[in-house]
Amino acid sequence: GKKVPRAAISLEILGRIERRYRLSAGYFLSLSGTPDRAPGDFDLNDISPSERRRLAWHLPEDFNRRPSQEKAEILNWVRTVIISGSTDYRRYQAAAIRQRYAVRFSCASGPVRKSSPARTPEESGIVIAPKRLNDEMADLLRFKTSTFAAFGMQRNGVWGTETASQKVEHFGLWFGAFVAPPESEVQGLGVDPKLLTFAMMIFPQVWDWYLHWRERRRGFYTKWEIDLLSIAAAICREETGWLRQSPRMGSSLRPIEGLVSEADINAVQSDWPAACDRMYKHARRRIKEIDRVARVHRDPFEPILPVLEAPSPVGEYRKITEEILQRMPDERHNARAAAEAVRAFLMLRIGLHTGLRQKNLRELLLCRPGALPTSERKLEDLKRGELRWSSRDQGWEILIPSVAFKNANSSFFGSKPFRLILPDLGRLYELIEAWIERHRARLIGEAADPGTFFVKTAKMTSTNAAYCQNTFYEAWRTAIQRYGIYNPWTKRGAIEGLLPHGPHSVRDVLATHILKRTGSYEQASYAIQDTPDMVAQHYGRFLPQDKSEIAARILNQVWEAA
C-alpha cells in the first residue's frame, strides 16, 4: 500500500509483531521512513481539535495505554514547556493575548490577526479607528516616513517600514486601553471612540492614567513604558515635534469624564506651545522615575539558557539541525513533511551561518543556478538580499545591501553590502539544492511564487506562500518545539531544558559563542552585523566565569609548555 500507518493502535500492533518475531524495535517504520505526522487517534476527546493537533506531535505512542494520572502529567508538561514555554513572561503573554483590546487603523498596511468568524471586531475587543483618528495616524506616518518633511515642518529622524508598522500597533494598543470597558478583563476607561484624538497626548494626566493602568496589568514597570514616554516627548519637542507643529489638532479635543475637563482643553488651546513644553518636561521626568524602578520581564536569554551555558553554544544549537536530519521523513512516502523538515533545517542552518535578523532572512530572494543575479542597485531599491550561486567562488552566496538592514547606518557596514559565501558543510549544499529543485515547489503548490528563498506551506485556507513577521516566527518556533526541546516522554528532541523561541535568539547564540572563545566584543559584533556596544548591551551573555576561563586558558599555556 501507499499509506503509512500512523494511528496509535496501528503502531502498537506493529510493535507487537516486532516483539513476536524478534525484530528490532521500529523495524516496520524504518522500511516506510519516518512518519510524516503525529498519531491521529490519541484519547483526547475533551480537548479541542486545534489543540489536539498541537499536542499530538509531542505525545508518546503508548499514550492511550498509560494510567490517567500519568496522561494528565504528560499533557501538563507538554502544554507548559513545549506549547507555551514555562517562563514568567510567556505565562503573562498567554493571558494577555486572551484579553484583546486595540484600535485598528486602516491607514497602515501590515499583517492583521483574524478575529473569530463568530465574532465581530468589536466583540473581540478590537475597535475600528474613527475617520478623524485614522486621518491623524496617516498624517503622523507621512510626517515620519516621507522622503522630505512637508513644507514648513521640521523633524528629527525618520521611521523605516518595520518601525512604522510597530508604532501603528503600539498606538493602537494605547488608544485601545482608553476605549476598553471598565467592567471587562482589560479594565479600561470606557471612552467613546469618537472622542479619541492624538491631541489627548498633550495632557500629563492622560499619560499618568495610562502608566498606572500598565502597572496594574503587569505588576511593575518595564522599558516598554519608557519607550512610549520617549514618543510622547518627541512629538511635543520644540521645533521638531509633530504634535507641537500641529496646533490645529487642539480643536479636536473634547472633555473626557474623570480625565480631561473643559477648563483643561481651554488652557491647552489658548497656549499650545506652553502645553507642549509642559508635556515634554513631564515625559522626561517620568522617564527618569520609571527607569529607576523598571524591571526586565522578558529575559531573551532564558529560553536558550542551556545553549548559552554550553562550552560551545553554536555546537549545542547545531544539535537541533542534526536532530532534523536524523528524523527527516522519507520523501517518497511523505513529500510535504520532508519539504517542511528541509525548510526547518535550512532556516536554522542559514541563521547560524549568517546571524541575520528574521526580516532579512524571510525576505531573502532566490536566484536559481544559471539565472542572472539581481543587480545590487535593484536589491537596494527592494531593500532585500538574495541567495545566488557564485561561479567565481563556486559556492552559494548571500548578498544583502546595507540599506536592507535595521542598522543600515551602523559603522559595521560603512555603506557597503553584506556578502557571505555559505560553507559546504554538514549537507548544507545538498539540501539547498534539493530545496530549490523539489521541496520548495511542493510547498508553494498552486499559489503564486513570492520569489523568496523561504516559503510557507500554501493551503486551501491560505494561498499566499510568502512569510510575514508572525508566520516566520511561528515556523522557527515550531521547528524548536518539534526538534529542539528534549521530551522525556518520547525521548525525542536535541537539548534538555530548551524552551520555545524565535529566530532572533540565534544572534544571542552566535555572539555568546564568539565571546566565550575570544573575549572580544568586536569579533562578536562581526557575527551579527552590529557594533561592540550593541553586543555588550543586548546580545552577548558573557559572565565573569567566562572571562576568567579565557584568562586561565592563556596563562595555563605557560605551565603546559614547561
Where in the sequence are the language-model features?
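Conserved tyrosine-mediated DNA breakage-rejoining catalytic core shared by Y-recombinases
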Residues: 259, 313-332, 364-430
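Charge-rich, intrinsically disordered N-terminal extensions
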Residues: 6-309, 522, 546-549
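Short, basic/aromatic-rich helical patch in the C-terminal catalytic core of site-specific tyrosine
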Residues: 347, 361, 503-517, 524-525, ...
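Active-site/catalytic core of tyrosine-dependent DNA strand-transfer enzymes
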Residues: 408-498
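Short pre-functional
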Residues: 166, 230-234, 342-367, 513
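Catalytic-site neighborhood detector that most strongly recognizes the C-terminal catalytic loop/helix
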Residues: 528-554, 559
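Basic, Lys/Arg- and aromatic-enriched nucleic-acid-binding interface segment
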Residues: 223-226, 311-359
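Short, polar N-cap/turn motifs at the start of nucleic acid-interacting alpha helices
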Residues: 370-371, 499-500, 519-540
